[in-house]
């Protein structure tokens, strides 16, 4: 699938291709790629794309411009009056699309209405960029709508009639006033473009004492979100100018442009297996087998890290079998000679792993099948960035569009929405009096720099109005607790263990940053549309003002997830998070049961202090229960670290070859 440049929800006017066609307006999800402008139905309840309703080939577009607004439009297409933009809490769906623009192509104008002027500008700019080399660009356009069989601006009755107004700025590569030429060749660059291309590159910074400047390759495309960002093109190389422990690095591209990039979008060129479709970094043997069987294709294969042999790789291959209807799977360790050559079959040596894979894609050479079809856990979608652009932590509420309410949490209502009409976000609307706001705002910048693939990313805050908003990554499948209770299927033990592993990876990261969660539980973990579990609300319990929540004697205090030292002395540490993780594992394996379900909070406190521990859930093996139980040692110092717990969880997975 082509890379998506822009994605937004707009109001689309019907094109009335037939004289009898009705004039109507419908909300559609628009996607822009290098080759097509497409629009789809949109499921506002689930936040998902529906069926495709139409598309326009980019090469057929002749003009993109604004349209003069209608006279006396209905409320949904009226520009909000001053002050209305800030009444955000009352909006649960996109209600207004007052900013029209037109995309003109061989079948006439396509009229689109944007919810904000800024979003309209962005789309017009990007559309003009992708059509700039089109051969049929026009230099006159119709500034007003086509209605009732004619253009309101000039009364011409032919839909494809020449425009009546000269474009103020040149359209694409042509200049205003220049005769129209039908040629498929791109026009030569203008003097301004020539100057830009020929501008000499700035000198490379001097190498550091440690050696040469770091070079990286982009794993994903990245479209800049602000002026300080640098665009990334998947597969392109970049030079790192400033590297830090923070999630944004300053980089330079091959054309000399400089800016900030998300560090989790690139990898060192010397370690670039991640750019290959066949490589899955964090996947276990049992997960690989499950995926290969689901795909069921002869020669399906996965290259993955070996969990039992650090630094080694394993190739898992599927082949059909007359004996077993589910097929058979073999796992081959990628071996390395003393001369650093790789092989699966000793007679065939290669200098790199990609060369080895390429060879076996054409030759089985001792394998049960040649490597025909790369299989992955999911399409490698781009990860979340730490903030919506470099240095952007204060978000303008006018850039937010509210789509639906997700629920109510400790701090107030949570809604699903879009940032600048394009990026899915969750918006926590903080109820006044529920949070120590000033203290949280001071800490928000620090929390934004916590970035890990198994943490729900904090994008930013809106603090210049009340209520304040916390903007985070959107997780389509909601909280883990409800996911466990409501999913209408039986979870396999490997799936439950993977959920625990996801959480443990996030907690190991927080542990390494000396950051405490303080309220780890299934209700505070979320599940995305790919079934990956991420830890949410880390550290937020410090800012709760409700005594019923902050006091260990309060009715809302998480007694059932708390160790004795917290219940007795309110003593929090990484080891109190470890205790909570053990209870979370119990929740997962009991499919969302309430811990200590037969006792109230005060009884639970008494029993925990006296040494009572949760029983082994039916779905948990003895080895899994041993990990849970190790988290509940009375002495905090005797509990394992999250790093040790992660190692134990990995060890439980099927033995590696």
UniProtKB/Swiss-Prot annotation:
Membrane topology: Peripheral membrane protein
Positions that bind Zn(2+): 142, 153-154, 164
N-acetylalanine modified-residue sites: 2
Signal peptide: none
Subcellular location: Cytoplasm; Cell membrane; Nucleus; Membrane raft
Active site: 519 (proton acceptor)
Cofactor: Zn(2+)
Record comment: activity regulation: Activated by phosphorylation.
Motif CAV1-binding mapped to chain: 579-586
Top EC class of this enzyme: transferase
Function: Non-receptor tyrosine kinase indispensable for B lymphocyte development, differentiation and signaling. Binding of antigen to the B-cell antigen receptor (BCR) triggers signaling that ultimately leads to B-cell activation. After BCR engagement and activation at the plasma membrane, phosphorylates PLCG2 at several sites, igniting the downstream signaling pathway through calcium mobilization, followed by activation of the protein kinase C (PKC) family members. PLCG2 phosphorylation is performed in close cooperation with the adapter protein B-cell linker protein BLNK.
Protein name: Tyrosine-protein kinase BTK
Provenance organism: Gallus gallus (Chicken)
The organism's taxonomic lineage, starting at the top: Eukaryota, Metazoa, Chordata, Craniata, Vertebrata
GN (gene name): BTK
């Amino acid at each position: 699938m082509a890379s998506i440049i822009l994605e937004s929800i707009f109001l689309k006017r019907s094109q009335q291709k037939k004289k009898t066609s009705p004039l109507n307006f419908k909300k559609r999800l628009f996607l822009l790629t290098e080759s097509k402008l497409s629009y789809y139905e949109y499921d506002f309840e689930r936040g998902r794309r529906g069926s495709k309703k139409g598309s326009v080939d980019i090469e057929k577009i002749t003009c993109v411009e604004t349209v003069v607004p209608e006279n006396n439009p209905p409320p949904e297409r009226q520009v909000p009056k001053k002050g209305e933009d800030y009444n955000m809490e009352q909006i649960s769906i996109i209600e207004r699309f007052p900013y029209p623009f037109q995309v003109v192509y061989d079948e006439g104008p396509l009229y689109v209405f944007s919810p904000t002027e800024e979003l309209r500008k962005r789309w017009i700019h990007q559309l003009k960029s992708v059509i700039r080399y089109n051969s049929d660009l026009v230099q006159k356009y119709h500034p007003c709508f086509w209605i009732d069989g004619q253009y309101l601006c000039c009364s011409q009755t032919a839909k494809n009639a020449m425009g009546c107004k000269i474009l103020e700025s040149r359209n694409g590569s042509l200049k205003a006033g220049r005769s129209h030429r039908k040629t498929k060749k791109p026009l030569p660059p203008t003097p301004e473009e020539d100057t830009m291309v020929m501008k000499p590159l700035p000198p490379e910074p001097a190498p550091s004492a440690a050696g040469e400047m770091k070079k990286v390759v982009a794993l994903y495309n990245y479209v800049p979100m602000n002026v300080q960002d640098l665009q990334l093109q998947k597969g392109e190389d970049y030079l790192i100018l400033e590297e830090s422990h923070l999630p944004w690095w300053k980089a330079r591209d091959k054309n000399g442009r400089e800016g900030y990039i998300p560090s989790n979008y690139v990898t060192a060129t010397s370690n670039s297996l991640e750019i290959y479709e066949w490589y899955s970094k964090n996947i276990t043997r049992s997960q690989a087998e499950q995926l290969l069987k689901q795909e069921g294709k002869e020669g399906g294969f996965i290259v993955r890290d070996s969990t039992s042999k650090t630094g080694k790789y394993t190739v898992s291959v599927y082949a059909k079998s007359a004996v077993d209807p589910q097929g058979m799977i073999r796992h081959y360790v990628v071996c390395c000679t003393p001369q650093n050559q790789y092989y699966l079959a000793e007679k065939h040596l290669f200098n790199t792993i990609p060369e080895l894979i390429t060879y076996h894609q054409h030759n089985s050479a001792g394998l049960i099948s040649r490597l025909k079809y790369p299989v992955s856990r999911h399409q490698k979608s781009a990860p979340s960035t730490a903030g919506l652009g470099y240095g952007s932590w204060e978000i303008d509420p006018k850039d937010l569009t509210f789509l639906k309410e997700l629920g109510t949490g400790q701090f107030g209502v949570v809604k699903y929405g879009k940032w600048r009409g394009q990026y899915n976000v969750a918006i926590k609307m903080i109820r006044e009096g529920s949070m120590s706001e000033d203290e949280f705002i001071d800490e928000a910048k620090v929390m934004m720099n916590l970035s890990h693939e198994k943490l729900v990313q904090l994008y930013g805050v809106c603090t210049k109005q009340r209520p304040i908003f916390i903007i985070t990554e959107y997780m389509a499948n909601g909280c883990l607790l409800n996911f466990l209770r409501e999913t209408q299927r039986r979870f396999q033990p490997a799936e439950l263990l993977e959920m625990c592993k996801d959480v443990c990876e996030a907690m190991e990261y927080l542990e390494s940053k000396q950051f405490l969660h303080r309220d780890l539980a299934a209700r505070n973990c979320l599940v995305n549309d790919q079934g990956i579990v991420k830890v949410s609300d880390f550290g937020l319990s410090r800012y709760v003002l409700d005594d019923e929540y902050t006091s260990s004697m309060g009715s809302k205090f998480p007694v059932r997830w708390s160790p004795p030292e917290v219940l007795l002395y309110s003593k929090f540490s990484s080891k109190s998070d470890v205790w909570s993780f053990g209870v979370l594992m119990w929740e997962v394996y009991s499919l969302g049961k309430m811990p200590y379900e037969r006792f109230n909070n005060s009884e639970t406190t008494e029993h925990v202090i006296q040494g009572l521990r949760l029983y082994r859930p039916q779905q948990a093996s003895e080895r899994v229960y041993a990990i849970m139980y190790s988290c509940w040692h009375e002495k905090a110092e005797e509990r394992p670290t999250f790093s040790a717990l992660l190692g134990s969880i990995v060890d439980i997975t099927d033995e590696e070859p």
